[in-house]
Amino acid sequence: MTSWNVRPATSAEIDRIAQVWFDGWHEAHAHLVPPDLTRMRTLESFAERLHPMLPDVRVVGASGAPVGFCALKDDELYQMFVSHEARGSGAAAALMADAEARLSAAGVTTAWLACAIGNDRAARFYEKSGWRRTATMTYHAETPTGVLPLDVWRYEKPLRA
């Protein structure tokens, strides 16, 4: 396994991060969510969504060429994707450890994340990382036309403050 340095994302990396997100999202979710949502999840839409959340995004990979990212929103591990070529390298585990440390440092005692129902690869990774599936819930996915309710698995993990 590679030793990964997790670092803040830069605005110059938005296009590459958006590509990682687009590729990973479509591979993991396109067959699990309504076709309308899949059509709205364009490369441009991911880049647009990244701009306001950039202060909460951390990446792994060479400067200018990240191969994975993680974004937080309040007490939620909001997004995490690793490029196909970096899977199995420890990149996701490094991003997860960093996310958990940041959430804990922010005073979060129980973190949560949403996982698409049927995204078994992600579910196995979360469970291996100590997260526990606690419920099926309705998640409000942001889209260009408003919010789309989706049933998802909710995972939680207690953190040390």
Q: Where do the PLM segments sit?
A:
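Conserved N-terminal entry element of GNAT/NAT acetyltransferase domains
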Residues: 1-15, 153, 157-161
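Conserved GNAT-fold acetyl-CoA-binding loop/helix
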Residues: 22-48
